[in-house]
Amino acid sequence: MSIDFPLGDDLAGYIAEAIAADPSFKGTLEDAEEARRLVDALIALRKHCQLSQVEVAKRMGVRQPTVSGFEKEPSDPKLSTLQRYARALDARLRLVLEVPTLREVPTWHRLSSYRGSARDHQVRVGADKEILMQTNWARHISVRQVEVA
């Protein structure tokens, strides 16, 4: 049995055309690849821990076919499923929020009304990361600095 792609066997060409037709498709594809990498990492950890799918299923409170299906085709795994699977391996799942616009460089703000030298009235607002870390929600997530091209 074979599956015909719209462009034959040229999957890379098909993906390139799909991205050209709908730029949001690239983000969807990247999200799916990231989910697959995460599931692959969980599978590798399960094997490293020498646990069977049956043992993981018992720890998760599901049946083995559920674990098998999750490992084979995680089309869009729920966060709670990923967390339960990780806990079944005595691991903890951590999410990292990447914000490409954050920079480590300090941000400076000049006061709009001043007398005398402007140098005396520059106020350091703080690096974006410092400001983020001062907010309450920042304690609950990790922020990774990403360079913007």
From Swiss-Prot:
Name this polypeptide is given: Antitoxin HigA1
InterPro entries per the UniProt record, alphabetical: Cro/C1-type_HTH, Lambda_DNA-bd_dom_sf
Domain of life: Bacteria
Subunit structure of this chain's protein: Interacts with SecB-like chaperone Rv1957.
Consequence of gene loss (knockout): A triple higB1-higA1-Rv1957 disruption mutant has no visible phenotype. A single deletion in this gene cannot be made, suggesting that it has antitoxin activity.
Domain HTH cro/C1-type: residue ranges: 42-96
One Gene Ontology biological process: negative regulation of DNA-templated transcription
PROSITE patterns, per the entry: HTH_CROC1
Induction (free text): Induced by hypoxia and probably by the DNA damaging agent mitomycin C. Part of the Rv1954A-higB1-higA1-Rv1957 operon, as well as the higB1 higA1-Rv1957 operon, which is probably the mitomycin-induced operon; the former but not latter operon is autorepressed by HigA1. Induced in persister cells in response to D-cycloserine.
